[in-house]
Every structure is written in structure tokens, then in C-alpha cells.
Amino acid sequence: MASFKGFSVNTVPVSKAKRDISSLAATPGIRSQPFTPSVDMSQSREFLTKAIEQGSMSIPYQHVNVPKVDRKVVSLVVRPFSSGAFSISGVISPAHAYLLDCLPQLEQAMAFVASPESFQASDVAKRFAIKPGMSLQDAITAFINFVSAMLKMTVTRQNFDVIVAEIERLASTSVSVRTEEAKVADEELMLFGLDHRGPQQLDISNAKGIMKAADIQATHDVHLAPGVGNIDPEIYNEGRFMFMQHKPLAADQSYFTLETADYFKIYPTYDEHDSRMADQKQSGLILCTKDEVLAEQTIFKLDAPDDKTVHLLDRDDDHVVARFTKVFIEDVAPGHHAAQRSGQRSVLDDLYANTQVVSITSAALKWVVKHGVSDGIVNRKNVKVCVGFDPLYTLSTHNGVSLCALLMDEKLSVLNSACRMTLRSLMKTGRDADAHRAFQRVLSQGYASLMCYYHPSRKLAYGEVLFLERSSDMVDGIKLQLDASRQCHECPVLQQKVVELEKQIIMQKSIQSDPTPMALQPLLSQLRELSSEVTRLQMELSRTQSLNAQLEADAKSAQACSLDMYLRHHTCINGHTKEDELLDAVRVAPDVRKEIMEKRGEVRRGWCERISKEAAAKCQTVIDDLTQMNGKQAREITELRESAENYEKQIAELVGTITQNQMTYQQELQALVAKNVELDTMNQRQAKSLRITPSLLSATPIDSVDGAADLIDFSVPTDEL
């Protein structure tokens, strides 16, 4: 299985709708069966969408086998107006699960759809008529197609009651004679072999056939394929045809904007600003055969990085102008054909679910036709099919366009019976050789001169400028016959006669085919009136119930809504966890609570910043003053420290001086004491010699003088010798 690279995700597998089991069990005509929850692919879709928006070049794709869901079997009774009632049963798909809530209205609407004679004998009403033997899902599909074709509306739960009323109104205003437009549409189907009843040929050998052919040629309001939603079928099919030819801008851009945008993100496009081919990042999908040569179908260089990837390279600088994922039709078409018959999902369904624009080669188209597996390959409402992958190749050769258009009209089983010769003509192998020779003539004109054909505005007429000599793709003998019929001058008179005769025949047939006895006609009229009255009352009851439920829901949510409004506009900075619990207690929705708490957090941060700024502004002056004072004090402290150091030096000098003086003083004092002691000794001697009393002599104090004790005692006689 190849990996996709950048497919746009616009159409994804429909998620299974959840249903209330208890309400379904109480619905009449439903047998209860076990319910299995469905697989939700929303996460995969979100992943792919984000990756594509970010320009991712490698998005892994995984095939998911969605398990079958056991749904309830529903039985409905359809009561046509002109025949007996019959029942249909089956399961309702998840996409139409809302119909389970309005089964009575569905039965009434199916009664009208099962009675095509109520709508002017319209061919559209006959084509989508509900018939006995249908399954419930087929009947619902027929009903949806009927509403889309007749009312140009899409069936939804919201407008279902309006659709039923419109069907009733349309049926009540009908007449028994069908309009000329419906006749012409029916006859055109027979003329071109597209009628489901088998191949028929319009006889134009007489005047009546010529008149019918002229009417068919003059009519332009015939739609063979219904549109999607409210898109007009002609606009829808014209858009598909333009995409098939690589002319997306020729389609109505009010309906095909997304597909056109994806187209120019995938296929080679000329960038007028850079004057070169754009470097495409998004990858496309090619359905091709294993034996065909893709390089012969493009003017660019073809590079294959691996078996599943193809790059188209610019011939000037080899940059990538387009990227494609190659899928072989032999690998997916047979499995898709078998899955369609078994009601399962195929690999091709998963491929188509991840892209809006797909390329398929002419060889792949011929392969699916040859092997009888072409149904559902190109006729997909969610995918726009482009024949070929190089726009210039398709526009210049038209190879495969007619075959693809034919496969879009009908299933292969119908084409094999009604358009066998056309298929044989389109399947001829000589067409590929002719296309190859025509494309070689394109390449001979030079690469640079062909760049203008890839301009997004598509200003030039593509192949019309390149191939004025190219012959027509087919020869239509019917067109010649219709042109010849214009020369008939009696056509208006014959046409009027034919119309009158047909009206008479239809009136006679309607009288002869009426199986109802005349005695039962009044009762049948009363029954129809009562049925219409019952339908009207049921619709009024449904509207009343819906209105009542809406009023109750509004009353219950009024208080909560008012509280939500108050909380959203209330300014608060309380972001505590307990506050979230209180909001949950008053039943505020989780998303609203989250929004409120985030808003409060932002307000709180804003106020914190504001308060911080104001406080900082007020404190800045004080801080500056304190800083200045601190600097002044620091200078004073420095000066005091210097003064203290000077004082300490002076003190040390003074201490040294004092110490020196003390030492000098002590020495001098000792010398004086010693002298006095010597004098005392001499006085003692003289006193003795003079016989003076010794007590009258004063002695020198020796104890008060340090070092006096060590002095020589002169009182002791010394030996002078």
C-alpha cells in the first residue's frame, strides 16, 4: 500500500452517528439487535488537515478496516395511491440515522414517491419510484434522489418536514398529462441509448420521428445525472466535464472552489511572478496500468524515486513541477468491484477519501472496461476525475476523455447493451497511436513556447491553438439527420398534430387502465383526504413537539447561559483551583470554565505587572536616597579609618618616645641615687670623724628607685689596697 503525500482532506469516511438505544427500542416496526459502537475517524482527519496546512510532504496513510456495525432492522409499510400496499425492511445507514426519529413522515413521503402518476407522469418520478422488492436502503436512496431531482433540495433532519410538505403540495397540484419537457427528456434517453429499458432507436423516416428529433435537439433542460446537494445538475455535470479535460477554471467557481484550489496545488502550474513553473509540494494520485509508459504522456522529465512515486521535473533546472503517487489499476479495481457487491469498503474507497482530484490514464480506463470492473471508478461525487496527469497532453490529444465521459453516464452493464458500438470505437488501440503522434507534434514546437499553456488563468484555448487541423473525435450520424430535419417546412404543423394525438392516446390509456370501480371513487377520494389530513396533523404534532422540546431546553439553559455571560464579562483575578471546582459545581461547561480561568490568569498577570511597576516607581526615590547616604557614610568611614591609622602611628611614636625617656630617666635616676649613696657614705665617714650623731644625717631612699639595690654599699669598709 503506497503512502500518500499531501492529499487534501475535504471528504473523509462518514463517522458513525451515535443513537439512543432506548428510544430506538420503543419505535414501532423495529426489532432490537445488539449495538456496536462505531469507529471515529475525526482524529485522523484532523491529523491530515494539520499536516497539509503545514505543507508536509510525507503524510503516512494507513488502511483501517472499519468493523461492521450491527444495526436495527426497520420495517415500513408503503401505501401507493394506485396499487396495493407493500412492506420494505432493512437497516438504515448511520448517515441517515436521523430518519429513525421520523418514521411516520418517511412512510407518508414514500407513499408519494411510490406513486409516480401523482407527479404529472414525470420521467424523473418514474426513474426514482419506490417499488416492491426493494430493500430499505435502496428505497431511502431513491427517495433522496427523488427529492434532489424534483425539489432541488437536500434531505436533512432539519428540513425533513418541509420536504414532506413540498412533496404533498407538488402531488396535489399535478395533472394527469405529463409535460412536453418530460417527454423530450424520455425520448432523448432513448435516442442516445441511455434509457435503462434497453437499446431503442428513434425512427426518423416519417414526419413524427423528425418532429421528435427536432424537439430533442432544441431542448436544453435535460439532466441525466443528479447534482450534489443543492447544485443544479447541469452545473455539477458541466464542472465534472471541465475537470476531466483539465479546465477547472471553466467550472462554476461558486461550487468548485476547493477542488480548483487543490488542482492548482497538484498539477503543473506556471508561476507568472517567478516566470517559471511552480515548485509543487502537494502530491496527487495517478491510476495507471503496470505496462504503460508514463513518460510518453508529458512534456516534462519523469523521475521515479521509488516504485510508487512519480515526479515531473522542469527541463530547464530539474526542479519538481508535480508530484504523484502511482497506484496500479490492476491492484485496486478488481477488489473494489467485489467490495461494491458485498457492501464492504475497498482500498480504492480509502484512496478516494483522502483526495478531491484524481488522475486516471486512458490505458487504465480501457483496462477496467476490458475486464468489466469499471463501475464506481470514475463516477464518484466526492472526487473530480482528470484524464491524464499532464494538462497539455489531455488538452491536445483528448485521449480517454470520451471513454471517461461515457463511463460517468452509465454502468458498464448498460453500456454493453445500449452503447456497444460506441464502446468498441473508443476501445480501439489505434487511438493511442494517433494520440502519441499528435503529442509528438506538440513537443516539436519547443519546451519554452509551451509554458503558456500551464498558466493558471488559462487564457489560451489550449489545443484549439495547437491543432487547428485536428479532426473531430467522432462522427455523429444522428446530428446529420437532425440538421436535415430543420429543412422541413411542415414541422410546426406536424408537431402540433402529434401533440394532440398523443394527448388523446394518453387520456384513453388512463381511462382504460383505471382498475378502480366507479362506486369506490368517492371512498378513495375520502381516503386520500383523510390521509392528507393525518399527514398534516402528524406534521403539526411533530412541529409542536420540536418547539416544546426547544422551549424546555431554552428554559433549562437560560440560567446557565446568563451565568456564562456574567462570568465571561466579570473581571476577576481569582485563579485558585478551588474556584474551578466552584464553577463546575454550578454546572458551567468545561470549555467555558477553561476560557474563564485563562482570562482570569491573564488579568492576574496584568495586575501583577502593573502593581510591580507602580511599587518599583515609588520605592525608587527612597532607594536612591539611601544609596546616596550609604555612599556618603562609606566615605566617612573610610576617612575615619585613615585618621585612626594616623592616630595609631602617632601613638606608637609617642609610646616609643616615652619608653626612651623612661629608660633615660631611669638611668639618670640610678646615677643620681648612686651619687647620693656615695655622698651619704662620705657624710657618714665625716660624721664619724667629726663625731656627729648619725641620726642627724638623712639617708638616700633606695627602695623607691629601681636598680638601687644593686648599687655599691659605701658603708662597708673596703680594702683600698
Swiss-Prot record:
UniProt region (RNA-binding), positions on chain: 1-38
This protein's UniProt keywords: Coiled coil, Host cytoplasm, RNA-binding
Subcellular location: Host cytoplasm
Site (Important for the formation of viral factories): 570, 572
UniProt region (Interaction with mu-2), positions on chain: 14-40
Region (Involved in the formation of factory-like inclusions), start-end ranges: 471-721
Single GO term (MF): RNA binding
GO cellular component: cytoplasmic viral factory
Outcome recorded upon mutating residue 572 to S: No effect on subcellular localization
Reported modifications of this chain: The N-terminus is blocked.
Result for mutant: residue 561 to S: Diffusely localized in the cytoplasm
Region Interaction with sigma-NS, annotated ranges: 1-13
Family: Belongs to the orthoreovirus mu-NS protein family.
Function field: Non-structural protein implicated with protein sigma-NS in forming the matrix of viral factories, which are large inclusions in the host cytoplasm where replication intermediates are assembled and viral RNA replication takes place. Together with mu-2, recruits the other core proteins to these factories.
Oligomeric form and interacting partners: Interacts with mu-2. Interacts with sigma-NS; in viral factories. Interacts with the inner capsid proteins lambda-1 and sigma-2, and outer capsid protein lambda-2; in viral factories.
Note on domains (UniProt): The C-terminus is involved in the formation of factory-like inclusions.
Protein name: Protein mu-NS
Species name: Reovirus type 1 (strain Lang) (T1L)
Gene: M3
